[in-house]
Amino acid sequence: SCNAYRIGITGPPGAGKSSITNQLIKHYRKKNKRVGVLLVDPTSPFTHGAILGDRIRMNEYHSDDNVFIRSLATRGSKGGLSKNINYISNILEYAGFDIIIFETVGVGQVELDVVESVDSVVVTLVPESGDDIQIMKAGLIEIADIYVINKYDRKDSDKMYLFLKNMLSMIDKNKWMPPIV
């Protein structure tokens, strides 16, 4: 049956998106789920090449037939994803993968296409993700189903937590309240 659950991992560059993705793979494999991972890397505007290096950090799964990891380049796509990512995710779904994780490039203010492609969005932030205004401008506040404050041992992590908590207090109480973890 084709009913894969799609999870988008997004956030600014260096927030630890690949670390979160790695932990999700581990979690779902313990539950005997087949996991497809589509990692998106930016394309250089100068050379038009891409490093495609995120999967190097996930080499513990290279011999696991129930984990498929593919790096994709943006190739001019401005939304934080690769143009073909939805087609590839459909192929993974038809191939029997239960969970499909989309990891976006480090996002800015207009790179929020992940919302249209997944069932749940995990916004990964770090204490130094920027001041409150920058985070609001980036649009990340509105798209999260779950917030992850990564690298919580760093300075100002409590400040980031309080900022998110205050922002969420303004949301209609009858709507989904994204947890902060």
What do the predicted segments below correspond to?
Residues 1-7, 15, 24-110, 117-132:
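Nucleotide-state-sensitive switch-loop elements of NTP-binding domains
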Residues 135:
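Divalent-cation-assisted or electrostatically stabilized phosphate/pyrophosphate-binding catalytic cores
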Residues 12:
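P-loop (Walker A) phosphate-binding loop of NTP-binding proteins
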Residues 18:
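Walker A/P-loop
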Residues 143-146, 152-181:
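Canonical P-loop GTPase G-domain recognition
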Residues 36, 122-123, 147-150, 154:
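Short hydrophobic alpha-helical runs that function as membrane-insertion/retention elements
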